[in-house]
């Protein structure tokens, strides 16, 4: 098996029994199970959900996206070795820690394979729940241009790049393109304020106004749990994005849960603590890959300017990135995962074959 064979780049072609189109995201693909298979698994596996809950198989890939494009490397390498397994392992660890700390549940019911989650269908909140402890990234870019109000929050004068903020800040943005909300442009990833959410809470998917307080509490509490755990590893939890949704419990009540992934190098910035104390930024997240791309291509504006999206897509499609750059990302992701979980990350030689075998023999889901 070659290195390229160990990478799961295409994850939307598995022969999983479904009666709905496969939903393919940038990194994960979702296979909605038939009603019969959902009910069978809920009964036979003892999942703690109502018997009519729709279930899905969520399969992560090793693809790497940045600036809304998928990149690939030399030698037919269509993704990052170990990336998918590392992301899932990190999220699994944090979700377990959340449960131990009495926080909300997640959408995950079962983990058949390092690349696979069995999840319950949730009603998503249409908010990217972003939490920041340091001023960097888009917040710093806005601040350095003189902006002092960010997502409805007034920032103090005199802040310096990459410094710790006086308090943990929630700076939400829209999830997807939302139309018909006063004062909110119909664009993806638009910064919004808490006031925007309060005035239009149902349009953002909140079932009641009080749940805005709950989502903010779960976001901050989750951030603090991860930050404290990473601090013990001398890693700095800089900022992160969570997602939330509603599910119905066995008593018929709605409850707010964590969705997607949490505290990963894809959804967060993580800095090396020793380097930060020396005045340097050593990224242990996808931000390092983004910075590599900005330095690698002669015209970085292509990656930053949304008006040049066709050029950006062609750039990603037509360029094989150096193998060493891809492997550096692999070392970053698997290194963070091994630090967080305290265990090596499994790198199956043929992940697709392994997934099919497990889902056939242990779940009877392969056609």
Swiss-Prot record:
This entry's Gene Ontology molecular function terms read: ATP binding; phosphoribosylaminoimidazolesuccinocarboxamide synthase activity
Establish whether keyword Lipid biosynthesis is in the entry: no
CDD domains linked = SAICAR_synt_Sc (cd01414)
Single GO biological process annotation from the record: 'de novo' IMP biosynthetic process
UniProt xrefs under Gene3D superfamilies: ATP-grasp fold, B domain, Phosphorylase Kinase, domain 1
Enzyme Commission identifier(s): 6.3.2.6
Q: In which pathway does it act?
A: Purine metabolism; IMP biosynthesis via de novo pathway; 5-amino-1-(5-phospho-D-ribosyl)imidazole-4-carboxamide from 5-amino-1-(5-phospho-D-ribosyl)imidazole-4-carboxylate: step 1/2
The record's listing under InterPro entries reads: SAICAR_synt/ADE2_N, SAICAR_synthase_Vibrio-typ, SAICAR_synthetase_CS
The source's domain of life comes to: Bacteria
Q: Name one GO cellular component term.
A: cytoplasm
Question: Which SUPFAM superfamilies did the record assign?
Answer: SAICAR synthase-like
The alphabetized UniProt keywords are: ATP-binding, Ligase, Nucleotide-binding, Purine biosynthesis
What is the reaction catalyzed?
Answer: 5-amino-1-(5-phospho-D-ribosyl)imidazole-4-carboxylate + L-aspartate + ATP = (2S)-2-[5-amino-1-(5-phospho-beta-D-ribosyl)imidazole-4-carboxamido]succinate + ADP + phosphate + 2 H(+)
Signal peptide per UniProt: none
Q: Which HAMAP family match?
A: SAICAR_synth
The UniProt entry, under NCBIfam families, shows: PRK13960.1, purC_vibrio
The Swiss-Prot or TrEMBL record describes its family as follows: Belongs to the SAICAR synthetase family.
Put simply, this protein is called: Phosphoribosylaminoimidazole-succinocarboxamide synthase
**From which source organism is this entry?**
Shewanella baltica (strain OS195)
Q: Could you read off the lineage of the organism from its UniProt record?
A: Bacteria, Pseudomonadati, Pseudomonadota, Gammaproteobacteria, Alteromonadales
